[in-house]
Amino acid sequence: MSEPLKPRIDFAEPLKEEPTSAFKAQQTFSEAESRTFAPAAIDERPEDEGVAEAAVDAALRPKRSLWRKMVMGGLALFGASVVGQGIQWTMNAWQTQDWVALGGCAAGALIVGAGVGSVVTEWRRLWRLRQRAHERDEARELLHSHSVGKGRAFCEKLAQQAGIDQSHPALQRWYAAIHETQNDREIVGLYAHLVQPVLDAQARREISRFAAESTLMIAVSPLALVDMAFIAWRNLRLINRIATLYGIELGYYSRLRLFRLVLLNIAFAGASELVREVGMDWMSQDLAARLSTRAAQGIGAGLLTARLGIKAMELCRPLPWIDNDKPRLGDFRRQLIGQLKETLQKSKSSPEK
């Protein structure tokens, strides 16, 4: 059987027409107005950037002043004059067969060549230290990018710079975890979780060892001058060691520059973090009762060495910190206190025997 037809439905009001978007009228600029047209300035300053980060970033990328350009131009002109005068002396000595003067010109050429080679080597190492900041910025962009094609080559370059062999287990796990459908953010993130912790663990061990040596040296040494010289020497060794672990070869000027950047970073951001992390344990009555004055000074020196190593690690590291993987000063503090207590107990028990 067929179903009966439905009754007709009458609407009281007519159907409403769908609103259509009206296009704006065309706006044209005259030639005079186009000359005075200027795009609006967009403030792209990151909100999370603090004073310390801005200061370190400005130190890493210094602006070339007029005086610096004048000094560099004067040095270049002086070098060209020395080379030209040396060539003229050599030609005159050859024409007059003045062999003594010719030998002096040859010795001067060797000295100038050695000096130029040293300057070029120092400049290359200093440029490599500055380039690490650009690599860290590039890694930060890749960690927020959804593009494809740059992440794998970037991570392979970082592994090569750090001296990680292709047969390393961590690098093999990274190769097994990546595939063609992943974007740059995922590939760099896998590298940060699988390969980068290998270098970070070595840097942490170096920081712990150097901090413990500084703590014990200050705690047992009676001479303040020896303490200062020892701490300065060990801190420089620590910076060199961390830079080598992350594939940065330091020269004289690049070493001074890194040391200055580390001290600058500590001066801006270190005091508040040091007070926050050391805080209650440092002011604890129990700790003050158990440790002597020299032991407390040793812990302070060890904490400063650890802080120096953490900041050097942050400046030499090719990737930014993610997922709260930054080393904390509290971890080294507990380790230093434990080692110092163990050493003091051994020193007290040895005379009794």
UniProtKB/Swiss-Prot annotation:
GO cellular component terms? plasma membrane
What organism, scientifically named, is this protein from?
Salmonella agona (strain SL483)
- Disordered: annotated segments: 1-35
**Compartmental location:** Cell inner membrane
| InterPro entries attached to this UniProt entry | DUF697, UPF0283
The entry's protein name is UPF0283 membrane protein YcjF
How is this protein positioned relative to the membrane? Multi-pass membrane protein
The family line of this record is:
Belongs to the UPF0283 family.
Could you list this entry's UniProt keywords, alphabetically sorted: Cell inner membrane, Cell membrane, Membrane, Transmembrane, Transmembrane helix
NCBIfam families registered for this protein in UniProt = hyp_HI0043
One matching Pfam family is DUF697
Which regions span the lipid bilayer?
A: 70-90, 100-120, 213-233
Q: List, as start-end ranges, the regions of compositional bias called Basic and acidic residues.
A: 1-19
Q: What is the lineage of its organism?
A: Bacteria, Pseudomonadati, Pseudomonadota, Gammaproteobacteria, Enterobacterales
